[in-house]
Design a protein with these regions (language model features):
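Extracellular C-type lectin-like domains
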Residues: 151-152
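N-terminal targeting sequences that direct proteins away from the cytosol to non-cytosolic compartments
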Residues: 1-77, 87-89, 101-102, 106-128, ...
Length: 192
């Protein structure tokens, strides 16, 4: 394959993890994002400051499931969806929106221009109560500035919670929030 040829489109695929109880459909044409590619991408497009790089090293845990619209490395902001799982710990008993209220101020410290577009609110995902927030900021990668819209869902489930994040360009030129929403609509937590 030469650089001018597009990567072969991957077929749609249902991804199931019975151990943690989640199922989601990767759309046709989207790609699995490996843990290594995810970490490389975080380092490449994140702020160059020391605090961000330390946060990547500390919190850049590999997602349990991750999809991107384009094969990495990709020269622009690659629309993506990532699913992580975290222990509830001291957050036990809190709603998804309450957890978001705790998480977002830390994120705002990493991005000086971060703007909350949709404040944390309760919603439902895959039959589970969840919190949702949408925010925008600028990622910088070398000489590039990438105006970004991120969406974050927190789904509490017992002693842990799912953290589902998605990102697109603000102008949606190479991928849309509607595409992300179509993936979100396939998530299922009731696998029994």
């Amino acid at each position: 394959m030469t650089a001018s040829q597009p990567a072969r489109a991957e077929p749609a695929e249902t991804v199931t993890n019975l151990t943690i109880g989640i199922q989601v459909v990767k759309p046709e044409g989207w790609h699995h994002l490996s843990a290594e590619a995810n970490l490389d991408n975080l380092r490449r497009v994140g702020p160059d400051d020391k605090d961000f790089q330390e946060a990547v090293a500390r919190y850049g845990n590999a997602p349990i499931i991750a999809f991107s619209k384009y094969v990495e490395p990709y020269a622009d902001l690659n629309p993506s969806l990532k699913i992580n799982i975290r222990p509830m710990g001291a957050l036990a008993g809190r709603s998804g929106s309450a957890i978001l209220q705790i998480i977002l101020p830390g994120m705002a410290k990493l991005f000086s221009d971060m703007k909350i577009e949709q404040a944390p609110t309760e919603t439902e995902m895959g039959g589970q109560q969840s919190g949702y927030a949408r925010f925008s900021y600028t990622l910088k990668s070398g000489e590039m500035s990438l105006p970004t819209t991120s969406e974050l869902w927190i789904v509490p489930k017992g002693n842990y919670f799912f953290m589902i994040g998605a990102g697109t360009r603000q102008d949606e030129a190479n991928g849309t929030r509607a595409e992300i929403q179509s993936i979100i609509s396939t998530i299922n937590f009731d696998l029994q």
